[in-house]
Every structure is written in C-alpha cells, then in structure tokens.
Amino acid sequence: MKQYLDLMRHVLDHGDRKSDRTGTGTLSIFGWQMRFNLDDGFPLLTTKKLHTRSIIHELLWFLRGDTNIRYLNENGVSIWDDWADENGDLGPVYGKQWRRWETANGATIDQIAQLIDGLKHNPDSRRHLVSAWNPGEVAGMALPPCHALFQFYVAGDRLSCQLYQRSADIFLGVPFNIASYALLTLMVAQVCGLRAGDFVWTGGDCHLYLNHLDQARLQLSRQPRALPRMIVNPGVTDIFGFRFEDFRLEGYDPHPHIKAEVAV
C-alpha cells in the first residue's frame, strides 16, 4: 500500500491548513489518484490493523438498500452510530441512492441492478456509473456521501472500477473505502463472469485531521507487509445474494491497530 502511504506523507509535508465542518481542523490537498492492480492482492492496509468485519458488513448493508443502523449493530458494527437518530435512521444515504433513486416523476431506479444488467449486456458502454450524490436529498442525509460516484470499465475479460471521493479522511476513512470498493469490484466481476482488474481511487479534498497527525507519523514509520487475498464464494452469481460468510481473508498480517478519534 505504498500508494496510500505516499498520499499520507505528501499531505503531512505539503497540506494546507484548513478549517472544517467538525471544528477539528485539517491539513488538506485537492486532487489525488491511486491505482491498485487487484491481481497483486487485496488492498487492505497492513501498516495498521483494519476491522474487516465492518468493511464487509457495511458494503452488504449498502447493497441491501438499508439506511438504518440496526443491521450493522446486530453484526457488531458501530461505524455509523454517531450519525444516526434515536431510531437508528440516517436519512436517504448510500443504500437509498444505490437501490431506490427517486426520479422527477416519482419512479425509482435501482442503480445496482441497472449496473449489473449493463455490464452483462453492453460491456463497452461508458455509462456504467452509480451515484450516491443526489442534490435533491442531500439536506435530509445524516452525512452527505463522501464516496460519491463510481464507474466500472470492461476491457477484454477484465473489470475495473474507479471511485470519486469528494471528501477523504485519509487516516480513518480512506483505508476502509479502498477495501470496500475493491471488494465490490471482486463481487461485480464474479457475477458478471469477468476477472477483477484495477481499482482506481480518486480523491477531491484529501485531508488529515489535526488530531490524527501523530498517528499518521507512527503509521509512516512502519514497514508495509505483503497484501492478503480475499477469497469470494464462487457459487454466488447474484450481486444481492452475497452474505458475510461468502468472504474469507487469507494471509492478513498487519501491524497493530492505531486508535484515532472520529471527527463527527
């Protein structure tokens, strides 16, 4: 994960000091890109331990179209708790937009089903996009989408994905997002009869919170280790049919976890 560490080092050395919504303050740059060849291994950070259970369950929760934290909490995942209301609701966040985007005439669009159909029947299309950024519903969201838009691309039998992340919390958020969309690429490739190619991460406002700088320096002092492999149950052929038990991580040998506070 040299690409990720290079971004962290660049922001520490060259980031502009900025204020932010949370009042914490950041070091920030605008515009950065990283590319991960998924043949090289699953891009899960090794310079600190990540909670893989949270990454998998959050992605399955998105794909369910769910916007209440009940499913996450039932599966030991608390990453959305700080933004939920007293009933566990988050408003029309990712799952709603992915699965039930509302049109002007009152109909809904299942962007994920549409994506899979397009990849299977018109792989060379340049319209394999899913957007979570719905200007008409942003005001009702507990947290507007940070990872706002993603696009798939087919070349031969290889499927690649590019994510645009408008707001990138480098220390806490970005490692989760890289792993989540790499996993989504493996899943989509499998159900479409393709091989996983590259995952491309593109960031807009890429920032380190000022209360994460010591943790970032500690992470940069650690030597990256070999990437693990994510094994996906080959029997699943429906993108909505995956369960947590269909994924197995092999060879993950990270450095210890580094604690850092979430800016809410």
Swiss-Prot record:
Query: Protein name, please?
Result: Thymidylate synthase
User: What catalytic activity does the UniProt entry give for this protein?
Assistant: dUMP + (6R)-5,10-methylene-5,6,7,8-tetrahydrofolate = 7,8-dihydrofolate + dTMP
Enzyme Commission number: 2.1.1.45
Q: Where does (6R)-5,10-methylene-5,6,7,8-tetrahydrofolate bind?
A: 51, 169, 263
Q: Which family does it belong to?
A: Belongs to the thymidylate synthase family. Bacterial-type ThyA subfamily.
Alphabetized InterPro entries for the sequence: Thymidate_synth/dCMP_Mease, Thymidate_synth/dCMP_Mease_dom, Thymidate_synth/dCMP_Mease_sf, Thymidylate_synthase, Thymidylate_synthase_AS
UniProt GO BP: dTMP biosynthetic process; dTTP biosynthetic process; methylation
Against HAMAP family, the record matches this protein to: Thymidy_synth_bact (MF_00008)
| Quaternary data | Homodimer.
The opening ranks of the lineage are:
Bacteria, Pseudomonadati, Pseudomonadota, Betaproteobacteria, Rhodocyclales
* Molecular functions (GO terms): thymidylate synthase activity
Q: EC class of this enzyme?
A: transferase
- Tell me which residues bind dUMP: 21, 126-127, 166-169, 177, 207-209
Q: Which domain of life is it from?
A: Bacteria
NCBIfam families hit by this protein: PRK01827.1-3, PRK01827.1-5, thym_sym
What is its pathway? Pyrimidine metabolism; dTTP biosynthesis
Subcellular locations according to the entry: Cytoplasm
